[in-house]
Regions:
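A structured beta-alpha segment of the ubiquitous adenosine-cofactor-binding alpha/beta core
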Residues: 81-82, 149-168
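ALDH superfamily catalytic-core signature
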Residues: 169, 177-225
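Residue-level signal for inorganic ion chemistry
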Residues: 10, 32, 54, 116, ...
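Glycine-rich loop-to-alpha-helix module at the N-terminal edge of alpha/beta enzyme cores
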Residues: 1-65
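Generic hydrophobic/aromatic pocket-lining and core-packing "Φ" positions
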Residues: 109-110, 158, 179, 213
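Short gly/ser/thr-rich secondary-structure transition/capping motifs
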Residues: 70-78, 150-153, 215-216
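Conserved small-residue-rich beta-alpha loop and adjacent elements
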Residues: 70-144
Length: 225
């Protein structure tokens, strides 16, 4: 199972995933552009970011340190030491949005692998194909069977993941109302929420207005080509 893999084995898997994605990066980029409608230039940049994310996770997979604590602050524990170790939490559910269909998926999958946790991934209904391509890379890299399950579901059916007691942590990226509803319904599960977006633009009176206009137009419409 995933929890029995050593740190160096998890690191090796993550590096293989990154290498496999790099070999297929044009396939990823074109799939992303076709299913999400993102311009190919932006799609290629996003794929590079996802590849980088798996490389970072590979490095971090060997840095999950514990602690050794002296217990000599009471007489009867003098000469004794406490050891703190970290263990995989268990099955994780990842729920991702449509706007960055490989980067935000990588942000869920890579840390789960680094920590030794199996994942059930629900990609956005509009953009499941990049996640399925990634699952191929993960399987070919040697991650145990069943360690990553990509399940294209409707948003309504995703509630089954929230209520399933086998899931120990839910990682959600999406809207504020849905995120807080997940937290409310999650019970004792741990929840990680990345909600909404604060994309305000402030142009000061002494700014270069030509530059500001160019950046505002780019930021507002880049996704549309």
């Amino acid at each position: 199972t995933t929890r029995r893999l050593t740190a160096f084995e998890r690191q090796r898997v993550l590096r293989r995933i990154s290498a496999s994605m790099a070999e297929r990066k044009e396939e990823f980029a074109r799939t992303l552009a076709q299913e999400a409608g993102k311009p190919i230039k932006g799609a290629r940049t996003e794929v590079e970011r996802a590849i980088f994310t798996f490389n970072v996770a590979a490095e971090e997979s060997t840095r999950s340190y514990g602690e050794v604590l002296p217990l000599d602050w009471q007489e009867f524990t003098a000469g004794r030491w406490g050891i703190v170790r970290r263990f995989p939490l268990g099955p994780v559910a990842g729920i991702t949005p449509f706007n960055f269909p490989i980067t935000l998926v990588a942000h869920k999958v890579a840390p789960a692998i680094a920590a030794g946790c199996p994942m059930v991934l629900k990609p956005a209904p509009q953009t499941p194909l990049c996640s399925l391509l990634l699952a191929e890379c993960v399987q070919q890299a040697g991650w145990p069977d069943g360690g990553l399950n990509v399940i294209p579901l409707s948003n309504e059916d995703a509630g089954l993941l929230v209520s399933d007691d086998r899931i120990k942590l839910i990682s959600f990226t999406g809207s504020v109302p849905v995120g807080w509803d997940i937290k409310r319904r999650a019970g004792k599960k741990k929840v990680v929420l990345e909600l909404g977006g604060n994309a305000a633009v402030i142009v000061h009176s002494d700014a270069d207005l030509s530059y500001a206009v160019d950046r505002c137009v780019t930021g507002g419409f880049a996704y549309a080509g």
